Structures are given as C-alpha cells and as structure tokens.
C-alpha cells in the first residue's frame, strides 16, 4: 500500500520515513518562554538528527474553566511565531478554532491544526482546507479511526490533499482516555501520514475539577508503544516547570528530559522501520 508524503519546507513526512517531531509547549505563555523552549528543542533535534516543527497554541479556546489562561490571542501569537521562525529557522504548527482564523494563521504558520473537539465542524474544516496549508487533523476522542475518512474527504473536496492524521486517545468512561494501537493501522490505510499525540493521550479530562489531569510518568511507555506502529511522527509538549505550566502541566514532559527521551525514540523508530513488511491478511 503506497503511502503519501507531505512536504513542509525541506521536511518530508511519511509513515515509512524517519519520524518527524511536532514539539513545543501547550500554549504561548510568554514570548520569552516560547523562545527558551524552542531553543532547547532545536538543540536536541539538531543533535539527534530529528526533523522538527515547533508547536504551541495562541488561544486555548476549549479550557475547562472560564477563568483558565487562554494565551496571547491571534495577533500577538502570530508575532511570536514569526520571531521563532526567523530566529530558529524552523516551521511552526498551531491550532485554529474558528473559520475566520484559518487564512491569517496559514499566512504565518506552516501547518495549521484542526482541534479534536472541532474535527467534525464542516465550515471550519473547509475554511482550513481552502488555505492550501498542510493540515494536522486531530482525531476526536469520540470518533472511531475509520470515521477519519469523512474528514479527509471534506478536505479533499475543498481542494486540499496536504493532510496529516493525528491520534490523541479515545474516551474511556469519564475523565479517562485510552489509545487503541489497532487504530493506527486503520488510519494508515487512508495512505496519509499518521502522527501520535502522546501528550494529550495522557490527559485525564476534567480530572482536577476545573482543569485536566494527566499521567506524565507514563509518557515514555506510551510514546514507545505508539512509535512501534511505524508512524510518520510524534506530537509532544514539554515545559521547564510543568507544575507551574498554565495549561496541561500534568501531561508535559520535563524539558530537561527531552534529549534522553528523544534519543530512545529515535533508536526505536529506526529499528521498527528496518523490518520488512509481513503480509498477514
């Protein structure tokens, strides 16, 4: 089964290629912190030879509480992304929540992301597709892997086939998520690159009453399990001080563990992709 390759600048993204990292922080807490986090990601990924795209949100529009921190907003967020791109020479990915945001975000960011909670919103999907930007489509917690085909079709019929699928876990009762490893193979049948968002798969939605809890201690185990499925890439959030992060700190990898973490994952990815395919159907 031929697998599509999506190109972002000099980076080639495909299920049979070395894994690509979409990594950064959950939300743009400040310009200085974003620069600090990106600098460490760039240092580590350059050392290890991992293709890298910086990730952060300019607005967290789906926080549990109305009092929760949301970010700097569209205008200021794009300024920070422009500075990061200029300073570190890396592509940037961020999420879009409303149709009117799609075009201005696509003019700055190399990849625009369709949030899991909004992945069936046709007007948003079409607006994003019409920018012709690369789109990272998060699989909603309530969707089966095979249902992602409908979202791909919406994008394709709007004229965009520069698409990536991203698993982030499925609802398992209340305040819990699980990852079905068989789902990766189902989504790969659509031939588009498939990523694994290990950070948000560790969430415990609403687990702290007014915010999400998480299981940071299990990030390495889950990331290894995901990449064992021969994926195009990993989606990861890290923070220098997770206990005081303004969003999803309980899920974030400690930034000072990034090199050791990615070193093991690179070795695993190389091993998995060295194996010949076995036809078992």
Curated annotation (Swiss-Prot):
Q: What class of enzyme is it?
A: transferase
The EC number on file is 2.5.1.55
GO cellular component terms, semicolon-separated: cytoplasm
Note the Pfam families from the entry.
DAHP_synth_1
The reactions it catalyses are: D-arabinose 5-phosphate + phosphoenolpyruvate + H2O = 3-deoxy-alpha-D-manno-2-octulosonate-8-phosphate + phosphate
Q: Which GO terms describe its molecular function?
A: 3-deoxy-8-phosphooctulonate synthase activity
Q: In which pathway does it act?
A: Carbohydrate biosynthesis; 3-deoxy-D-manno-octulosonate biosynthesis; 3-deoxy-D-manno-octulosonate from D-ribulose 5-phosphate: step 2/3; Bacterial outer membrane biogenesis; lipopolysaccharide biosynthesis
Q: Which Gene3D superfamilies match?
A: Aldolase class I (3.20.20.70)
Task: Give the highest taxon in the source lineage.
Answer: Bacteria
Q: What is this protein called?
A: 2-dehydro-3-deoxyphosphooctonate aldolase
Task: Tell me which species this is from.
Answer: Pseudomonas paraeruginosa (strain DSM 24068 / PA7) (Pseudomonas aeruginosa (strain PA7))
